[in-house]
Amino acid sequence: MPAVAGRADRVIAASLDLERILSLVRPSATSLVSMFHGEDHWRQVASIGLDLAARTPGCDPIVVVLFALLHDAQRIGDDPDPPHGARGAALARSLDLGRFGFSREQLALMEAACRDHTGGGLSDDPTIGTCWDADRLTLWRVGIEPAARYMSTAAGREAAASGRRFACVSDWAEVARRLG
């Protein structure tokens, strides 16, 4: 079933394939257990991203979840590692995620979001902007207060300006449920 067929089909496909995709990412992940950049962080970015996506017209929540899974998967340690986003995008390409029914456009957006997420820039694309905002709204975990001026979307700016903290989800099944 294609992940992009229609809203209901997309949600079902993503829910069914999320664990399979994770099973491909985990063995290649260099930061899996990192307290700052590991799988708990990926899940938090996915959860925040889904909150923001629901309030961002034109945002593709599937891409946001894929970004969350891959953006820090190739990070080496918790010290500065600027090329880790490009390595995450390369990992995504190597996994041949198109076989799960994602469109070329979705995969290109996810790769661009991964590749460029550490540059500190803003994006006019609602999906890429949501990805970056979701990651930046977790900066408090490394002692940095998220700032509205570094958010690409209205939802991200509002969350940063208010100091909002997002509820964490405890497992990927909850992320998959929230795609609906």
Show the residue positions of the predicted features.
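Short, charged helix-to-loop "capping" segments that act as catalytic/coupling loops
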Residues: 77, 95-100
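His-Asp-centered metal-binding catalytic motifs of divalent-metal-dependent phosphohydrolases/nucleases
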Residues: 61-80, 84, 88, 110-118, ...
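Generic N-terminal amphipathic, Lys/Arg-enriched alpha-helix
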Residues: 21-31
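Short coil-to-beta-strand
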Residues: 16-21, 59-66
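An amphipathic alpha-helix signature
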Residues: 18-22, 46, 85-93, 111
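Internal alpha-helical transmembrane segments of multi-pass membrane proteins
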Residues: 102-105, 109
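Active-site metal-coordination segments of metallo-dependent hydrolases
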Residues: 32-44, 75-90, 104
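Divalent metal-dependent phosphate-bond-processing catalytic cores, especially two-metal-ion Mg2+/Mn2+ enzymes
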Residues: 1-16, 30-58, 70, 98, ...
